């Protein structure tokens, strides 16, 4: 994965590209900068709302921060997006995450 600074150069070159924001979210999460990571994932979703894996990442971060209700809502939104775009792998992974999170309540 490129460094945060390299990803930010890509975002500066094309701020409308949702993948750059998603990559930034992944890197920030790796660096344990969870709030900033969520912001980057949301920026990615503002550019393309049909990204189930951005929702997956947000749900996982929220769950790790103890925000179960919000995590479940994010996972359900991702599942809805995965289903509507016909992505069976993302649907399966998000469905499993919803079940896991609901079981943790």
Outline where the language-model segments fall:
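Canonical positions in the second alpha-helix
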Residues: 9-10, 43-44, 78
């Amino acid at each position: 994965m490129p460094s945060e600074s390299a990803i930010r150069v890509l975002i500066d070159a094309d701020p409308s590209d949702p993948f750059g924001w998603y990559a930034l979210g992944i890197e920030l999460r790796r660096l344990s900068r969870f709030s900033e990571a969520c912001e980057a994932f949301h920026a990615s979703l503002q550019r393309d709302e049909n990204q189930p894996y951005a929702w997956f990442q947000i749900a996982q971060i929220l769950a790790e921060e103890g925000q179960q209700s919000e995590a479940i809502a994010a996972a359900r939104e991702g599942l809805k997006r995965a289903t509507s775009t016909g992505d069976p792998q993302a649907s399966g992974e998000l469905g499993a995450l919803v079940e896991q999170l609901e079981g943790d309540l």
